[in-house]
Curated annotation (Swiss-Prot):
Component of the eukaryotic translation initiation factor 3 (eIF-3) complex. The eIF-3 complex interacts with pix. GO terms for molecular function: mRNA cap binding; translation initiation factor activity. The lineage of its organism: Eukaryota, Metazoa, Ecdysozoa, Arthropoda, Hexapoda. mRNA cap-binding component of the eukaryotic translation initiation factor 3 (eIF-3) complex, which is involved in protein synthesis of a specialized repertoire of mRNAs and, together with other initiation factors, stimulates binding of mRNA and methionyl-tRNAi to the 40S ribosome. The eIF-3 complex specifically targets and initiates translation of a subset of mRNAs involved in cell proliferation. In the eIF-3 complex, eif3d specifically recognizes and binds the 7-methylguanosine cap of a subset of mRNAs. The gene is eIF3d1. GO terms for biological process: cap-dependent translational initiation; formation of cytoplasmic translation initiation complex; regulation of translational initiation. Pfam families: eIF-3_zeta (PF05091). This is Eukaryotic translation initiation factor 3 subunit D-1.
Amino acid sequence: MTETINTAAQFPSFEKPTVQFNEKGWGPCELPDTFKDVPYQPFSKNDRLGKICDWTNTSNNDKKYQNKYASSFGTGNQYSYYHEEDETTFHLVDTARVQKPPHQRGRFRNMRNSRSGRGRNARGGLNTHGMTTLSGKNVKARDPRHGRGMGKKFGHRGPPPKMRESSVAVRADWASIEEMDFPRLIKLSLPNIKEGVDIVTCGTLEYYDKTYDRINVKNEKPLQKIDRIVHTVTTTDDPVIRRLSKTVGNVFATDAILATIMCSTRSNYSWDIVIEKVGDKIFMDKRDHTEFDLLTVNESSVEPPTDDDSSCNSPRNLAIEATFINHNFSQQVLKTGDQEPKFKFEESNPFISEDEDIQVASVGYRYKKWELGSDIVLVARCEHDGVLQTPSGEAQFMTIKALNEWDSKLANGVEWRQKLDTQRGAVLANELRNNACKLAKWTVQAVLAGSDQLKLGYVSRINPRDHSRHVILGTQQFKPHEFATQINLSMDNAWGILRCIIDLVMKQKDGKYLIMKDPNKPIIRLYDIPDNTFDSDDSDDGEGDDEGFQQVYNYAHNKI
């Protein structure tokens, strides 16, 4: 008997599904109820769908790349992740604080380091020279305060920076020819400039007193007020340059004017130089009755002096004080007297006549020339302040300058009476930071003159509140070329800046021009000015042109 096998019961049946036909596009015409209201976005398996949370460190790097977790397959952003700050718990808090004077800022810094276990020479602590040391290459990356654009002025509630005034008021009839920014000037270079050749030597020098080399903090010496005439004659008023301009050279200047131009990239204060072009000759002059010959104080400091003019610590009064100290120090350290030997050059002082019976400062003048290429011959008057006789009997010429301490607490400086004998390098490094332009100009003047030594004196106030009495705390000497290397002063760059300005003026027509450093920007501008500008009979002279120096001390502009 054969049994009938029911194949339909043993195998599942296949039901034909209903397929919707979409005449207008791809995909089904209707969505099932289970997939309704569900967002859809095209995606790729390479997309990053999430991020590991880090609750221990808040970083600002994601703000720059907010779309790095977005889909790279489509244009939708349904599932994109954005790192946003939670502002639900944000409240305004008064963070204003009283502005402390400069000498009180950071007074507990060492105490905080000691409490946190960061002592001297420890990791991240202070070394023996008082400088903070940070180990590791990515220290700034681990500190959120060092983020880009963060931490520099965070929480700053101080007054806005004071705008400096221009050295001369720019008039409406002045035409601006060229603007030279410092980044461009720093890249200039004019190598292989040989040493200047002497043309004429004038004046009389006194010998240096070596007893001043033994002065220290414990054996200080008062600074004397010496009544001597110091001539600061500009280029066109120099009778020797007038004589030489007929036969030698086509660019004429003084060492002070050249040093100002060569070190212009280190200057912050405004200054100006008048240039007159006559045919193929250029004469660089300073204006009369200006502050060009005053020595700046803390010009390159982080917090330069900004007191009112009535204060003895105002920028102008400090400059007059520094000039007063520098002139007196350069004469006090010399052996004076009728019986003392003197070094005489070929010609006498060109700024005094034979019948004049006056006390003239010890200054030797060298009129030198340099070949700058392209038929440009520079003639300049350089100066020596003294002469030193070596044991072999050879005469070494000196450039003598003085650094002055006015108030170390207000100047954020180093206390000289505590550090000068034991850490003189730290004192000099601090002065290089605060007076970079002034020291660079002194070095350039010594190099141009061919001085064998650059003698620096350290002069301080007896009382920080008394700006009329000073003491000498020590001296230090350098070779000008070696000191230029120490302060990162490139003479090739200095010659390049000077040559750039000479070339610009040579391209102009005959007339009068003015170079001015912008008081608030690192820019030098060249102006074309009328020929009668700054003349003595010009009643509409610039602001402050007819104003002499303030009589803070009992000496005139050219008298110590």
